[in-house]
Structure formats: structure tokens, C-alpha cells
Amino acid sequence: MTTDVKAKNPASIFSHETLLHVLNDLSAHDLAALERVSRSWNSIVRRSSVWHNLYLSEFGTKHLRRHGRIEKKRRNWKGLFRRQSNWKDGRCKKVESMLPQLLNSEKSVGEDRLGLTLTHQNNIYFCNDVQISKWSSVGNSLKCQAISSFRDETVKSGPAVMCLDNASLYIGLKDGNLLHVTVHETGFGNIENLATFSTKFVALSSHKNYICGLTNDNNLYILQHSHQAGTKLKVLGKYHVSSIEKQVAIHFQQSKEGYEVVHVVFNDYVLSGGWTVSLQEFVFNEYCVKSSRLALHDNKDIEYSQQPASAIFMYGSYILTSHPDNSLILQRLYSTNNELRIKFLGRLLGHVCGVQISKLFSCGRIVSVSKNCADICVWDLHDTNYQSIVSPLMLTCTNIHNKPVSDYEKECKVQDIGLYEDTILITLSDGRILKFLFNI
């Protein structure tokens, strides 16, 4: 390994976690050389900001020479990282749209009017405090399939969370109201207000006519939606879970022995190790909740993190967590001797910025997005041995915003990710829809 004595502190270019991943296998001689380059090595430990933002902050007309040196180091580092992580470059074409412009409404401006988006296959459901609409990805554009306006007495605040199961779309509003909309091929059905809760939902999932959600006051509800006249919503179970963080994943499993099963995955802190995830299983029927149990970890291979997961997603028996230390953790839930256990499968390395959100799809692929969309990874898990760490196929999208460099410092959250064939749909909190057509 070659070093430049005149180089700047590596902490001004890379994050501490990135250095740990890349330099994990360096010899003692190489580490000594790095220490000679930077005497203030402790500053790397104290720094947690992403190297990409630091790199961009160095750019300016008065610092072209410095920019050139950092750019050279960045290229050299990316080459080293490719050899270390076995990533591959993906070819992709970016198509960018903005829903408020497509809606062509004067009210669809401002942060409060941007609303919430939900992706399902190649469709995008958009909802704000004015209307709900369904958009379909056709070629390089978005086509409106259906649109319906809310009555003033129905919606008085914007949406906080949405979930979709077959033809039923449930919307949790910020004022605590829970709405139900039937989705048809030609449009939307009647919008009905099922119930009003004390606070808004922060997580929501549905299966058949059952709903499970976590409210902002740490109450977990298991509900049944009755389509008959009279009571629209029946409470099967209510639990106060004060220890659960707001970042949770709720997933319904297939029915067994006449009972429904729902899993709630949440961040959990262990004093002896650090942050991990725990899972609570609830078994219920149309009358009540029968039982609940907590999944156990295999102590031999439990994986900890220094910070809680920024996003949790569950598909089937697989649990996927996104972490600010540039990694994803893949785990699997299994049952043995009447016990639920969580087994660690591998830590997926490939990001250069903290991972904000990731999703596992039925086709066996994972799509993960970094903070501010600095980079996007596609992981192909098809016909892969889950016992080993999976190598990523990476789509590098450094100019994903297609705007001035200063926009990278602006906080922009990813609301949802969709994957349909070879198309990735990413919805952002500022109203933009990013579409990527990639070839593997």
C-alpha cells in the first residue's frame, strides 16, 4: 500500500465505518504507514459523518486543486473497495418526475401538501390531505390510473402511514383517524373512516381483513375490519409496548391451524453487546389473541451494532435491517422444539454512505438506498447460499438529484422503494419520483 505523507487527515475524506471495512485486512506495516500520515488518528473515531458529504463540501471554485487531489483519492479508494467487496457496476438510466407537477394542482405545493407515497409493483399510490391517486410506470413516464378527492369532513390532516393488501388500502392520518379505500382497476371505491385513535399510527400492516399497527403512544393494536353493517372495526388485542422504538416492521405470516400469525420486529438494546433486533409473535383468530411469544437469538452468532437500525423490513422468514455504518444485516426466523429463533446469515457490505432504507422482494433481490440517495445497491440473492455474505451488484448514482452540489446537504428522506422486473422506483419526501432502468 502506498501513502502520501502530504495527504490530509483520512477522517476528512472517509467515515470511520468505511475505513474499518476497507482496511480490515491491512497488515501492521500498512497501519503504521497510515498512522504516520495522520497523527490525529483519534479524530476518525470521533467522526461519524459520511465521507461523501465531506467530499462535496470541499468542492469550490477557489479550491480546484484540493478538489482534484480528493477526487484522485476517491477514485483510488473506489478501486480498492471493488477488489475488497467484489462489487460490480450496473448500467442504469435515471428518469426523474415530480408528483405535484403531474397532479397539476395549485394546492400541491409546500411540504405539507407533498403527502405520502406507497409503491406496489410498478404502481405508485399518492395521498395527501386533498386527494388520493394511483400512478403507473409506463416507459419513461408516469400515467395516472385513478384519482379521488377527499371530502372536507373526512380528512382534516395529512397521512402518516399507508399499507396495501390486495384491493384494500388503509391510510392512517396524523390526527389519529384510520381510513379504508377499496382499489379497483378503474378507480377507487368509497372512502370510509373506520375509527379514531388517540394518536397517529407510526407503523401499519394488513392481511385479509386484519390490521396490525403501532401508534405514537406505544400502543400495539390487532384489529379486524368488518365489512358488515354496524361495527366497522373490532379490537382483538391491545398492548402497551413502552420499550419498543418507533422503527418497527409488522409482517403477517401465512395462516396455520385456523389461526392468523403476525410478527412485530423492533430495535432492541443488549447491555452486553449493543443494538440488535427482537421479534414478538402474536397468534390470533377472529375472536381474540390466543398467544404471544418472543423469538430467541442464537448466542453463538448474534450480531450487534453500535447504533439502532435506521430501517427494518421483513419478508417471509427473512429479516433485513439497514444501518448507518454502511451495512445491511440479513437474518432468518425459524422454529425448533416449539421455540422461535433468529439466526444471523450475514452482513452485507457495499455502501459508502449510511444506509437509510432497504427492502427484500419476492424475486430474491434487495434494493438499498443511502442517505440523500448518494448511492443505490441492488443485491441479487437468487440461488445464493444465505450462509455466506452476499456480494452486491451496485448501481453508482452520484448525480441522482441532478441539481447543484449543495442539495446533497439538504435533508431528503426516502419514503418507499419499488422493484418491478428491471425497474427501480424510489419515492422521496420532497415529492420526487426516481426511476432507474438497469441491466444485470
UniProtKB/Swiss-Prot annotation:
Gene3D superfamilies: 1.20.1280.50
Main location: nucleus
A Gene Ontology BP annotation from the UniProt entry: ubiquitin-dependent protein catabolic process
GO MF annotation: an example: ubiquitin-like ligase-substrate adaptor activity
Alphabetized InterPro entries for the sequence: F-box-like_dom_sf, F-box_dom
SMART domains (UniProt xref): FBOX
Key word Cytoplasm present: no
Cell location: Nucleus
Keywords of this entry: Nucleus, Ubl conjugation pathway
Domain F-box: 8-54
Source taxon at top rank: Eukaryota
Cross-referenced SUPFAM superfamilies: F-box domain, NHL repeat
PROSITE patterns: FBOX
Keyword check for Magnesium: no
Gene Ontology cellular component list: nucleus; ubiquitin ligase complex
Subunit organization: Interacts with skp1.
Annotated protein name in UniProt: F-box protein pof12
Lineage per the UniProt record: Eukaryota, Fungi, Dikarya, Ascomycota, Taphrinomycotina
Gene coding for it: pof12
